[in-house]
Amino acid sequence: ITLPAGLIGFPELKQYILLDHESDSPFKWLQSLDDGAIAFVLINPLLFKPDYLVEVSETEISDLKIEAEEDAVISVIITMPSNPKNMTANLKAPLIFNLKNRFGKQIILNNSAYTTRHNIMEEVKKRAEEAGKDDAQQLVAKVKKAHSDSQVAQDGSKVTAK
């Protein structure tokens, strides 16, 4: 995947590969091909925040050459601290990928309801109260399992899978 503008804080890193964490995991790895020590954990935000709304401008759609809605995928970067209850997602700056041409872009949303450190488990608890507890418990179990299978370096700069 090519990110012509890079990511916020990493503008020089433009080439990535998107990897599955495990077949049943909600997480993906965005591994830099420019610097093998850099990888980010991604998740589909709709899995824990079904009302998440990303307004993409015509310019961004044009930049990514998105022709059909199904070609676009939205992901957010998450942080995975040692305690999974403190796992957060950057809902303020999602990534949009065009799976057809393998281009992507990180955008910054103007919506003040979204933060760079949105607590995932709190959102899952809200969802459990609103919907059925079975769905939320399954998501919590997947998140905890994926978290236990992952390891984050102390400085947060490197993420590796066991």
Predicted feature locations:
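Long, compositionally biased stretches
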Residues: I1-K49, E69-S148, A153
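Short active-site loop/helix that positions an aromatic residue
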Residues: E58-A68
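Long, low-complexity, intrinsically disordered segments
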Residues: Q151-K162
